[in-house]
Amino acid sequence: MKDVKALKLMTLNDVLSQINGDMTLGIGTGSTMELLLPQMAQLIKERGYNITGVCTSNKIAFLAKELGIKICEINDVDHIDLAIDGADEVDPSLNIIKGGGGALFREKVIDEMASRFVVVVDETKIVQYLGETFKLPVEVDKFNWYQILRKIESYADIKVERRVNEDVAFITDNGNYILDCKLPKGIDPYKFHEYLIHLTGVFETGYFLDMADQVIVGTQEGVKILEK
């Protein structure tokens, strides 16, 4: 049986086939992108592509620069041709949860700008409903994070925790906190997102709804391509 890393690497050829010529490329954050990015950089170099990357986190921008990929800031581009990113969960409608790496706001900005948004996952990320195996991240202001937590818990039977890293509160690249929400089955993601996004102090949610154009899945049987 292949491990998760092997399943992710299986998707490599399908990911690389999306990259060509002159392109502004949105580069996602997380373990999948960190695994695939060196091969993407090698392809760009070998084929002489004129690729400019727009990165979703400081961490991935540092790695991309080290690999020789030309990087620019989001405000330096008018459009993004293709965004490639991982996901924490994908449901049957290709709605996804992202934000395990804490970069959900910047990921959403870049993925929404992209003409095409391709998601790369292994089969463990495919679920029947959002929240089945992964907590929904919500990026919030430090000032009133606890009041937001209480309001989220009052919405339904939701357990909410402020994210910590080695006993220290996790801070996003935007200087905010992350609240991780364990969702019960039956939560409507559209309604819950609307509730959250209208709470004062909520920066963004980890719901990426109706955004993915294609999901590339590494499975024990091979690569599966999911499209709407």
Swiss-Prot record:
Tell me the enzyme class: isomerase
Active-site residues are E107
- Which GO CC terms are listed, alphabetically? cytosol
Q: Molecular function terms in GO for this entry?
A: ribose-5-phosphate isomerase activity
Q: Which GO terms describe its biological process?
A: D-ribose metabolic process; pentose-phosphate shunt, non-oxidative branch
Q: Which InterPro entries match?
A: NagB/RpiA_transferase-like (IPR037171), Ribose5P_isomerase_typA_subgr (IPR020672), Ribose5P_isomerase_type_A (IPR004788)
Its annotated pathway reads: Carbohydrate degradation; pentose phosphate pathway; D-ribose 5-phosphate from D-ribulose 5-phosphate (non-oxidative stage): step 1/1
Return any one Pfam family short name.
Rib_5-P_isom_A
EC code: 5.3.1.6
Which catalysed reactions does the entry list for this protein?
Answer: aldehydo-D-ribose 5-phosphate = D-ribulose 5-phosphate
| Keywords, in A-Z order | Isomerase
Q: Where does substrate bind?
A: T29, G30, S31, T32, D85, G86, A87, D88, K98, G99, G100, G101, K125
Tell me, in a sentence or two, what this protein's role is: Catalyzes the reversible conversion of ribose-5-phosphate to ribulose 5-phosphate.
| NCBIfam families xrefs | PRK00702.1, PRK13978.1, rpiA
Which proteins does it associate with, and in what oligomeric form?
Answer: Homodimer.
Q: What PANTHER family does this protein's entry cite? A: RIBOSE-5-PHOSPHATE ISOMERASE (PTHR11934:SF0)
Concerning its family, UniProt says:
Belongs to the ribose 5-phosphate isomerase family.
Q: What is this protein called?
A: Ribose-5-phosphate isomerase A
Q: Which organism is it from?
A: Staphylococcus aureus (strain COL)
Give the gene name: rpiA
